[in-house]
Regions:
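Metal-dependent catalytic cores of enzymes that make or break cyclic nucleotides
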Residues: 1-210
Length: 210
């Protein structure tokens, strides 16, 4: 349960931070967190790593500086860490979720922010990563942010996350081919998906080897 996850995080938090962490070490920590989250369910295997890859490809296409791309890639690896607080019976459910189950799934975004905000090296990423289910039309969660409140970095992670969620196999359906995925995403450009990030995604995907 989420309170147990939070208790564990707080218990591990030192009284003072005296260790200087280099970028390579932070990359490794973020990747390890992502692997732990992804191993929670067979349907999320590799998800965080793929979202990080697509995030970096979009960021590169948009011309973000290398150091900013590296920072943002960590945010993508960590975006679903809050799912450690959501029951597998909900995450792996093949049918439609009821209201209580859907609320439990939505809570993972707030858990992500709570967990990352307690880790000094990742505190700056807490809001950026946790907001990946916010929408430009204000109908997202956990805060219902409007377009002007959603950073470019979050918009990039959101675009990458949606792309992987559709192209990956789910409990209730098989994987959807990339052309069909892009068609489905295009219907949500301007409401859930940033148009600039979507165009960058398409350009990035076109550059990938077949």
């Amino acid at each position: 349960a989420a309170p147990d996850v939070m208790s564990a995080v707080l218990a591990l938090e030192p009284a003072s931070h005296v260790v200087e962490l280099d970028d390579d070490y932070l990359d490794d920590i973020a990747a390890a967190f992502g692997q732990v989250v992804d191993s929670k369910s067979p349907y999320t295997s590799g998800h965080s790593a793929r979202v990080a890859l697509y995030t970096d490809l979009i960021a590169e296409t948009l011309g973000l500086a290398p150091e900013r791309r590296r920072w943002l890639k960590r945010g993508a690896l960590l975006h679903d860490v809050g799912k450690l607080g959501v029951s597998n019976s909900v995450l792996d459910k093949p049918g439609k979720l009821d209201a209580e189950e859907w609320a439990a799934v939505q809570a993972h975004a707030a858990y992500t922010e709570a967990i990352l905000s307690r880790i000094g090296a990742f505190a700056e990423l807490a809001v950026v990563s946790a907001a990946h289910h916010e929408r430009l039309d204000g109908k997202g969660y956990p805060r219902g942010l409007t377009a002007e409140q959603i950073t470019l970095e979050t918009r990039i992670i959101t675009t990458a996350d949606i792309f992987d969620a559709i192209t990956a196999e789910r409990p209730y359906r098989g994987a959807i081919p990339i052309p069909k995925t892009l068609e489905m995403m295009a219907e949500n450009v301007g409401t859930a998906i940033d148009p600039v990030c979507f165009e960058a995604l398409k350009q990035a995907i076109a550059r990938l080897p077949a």
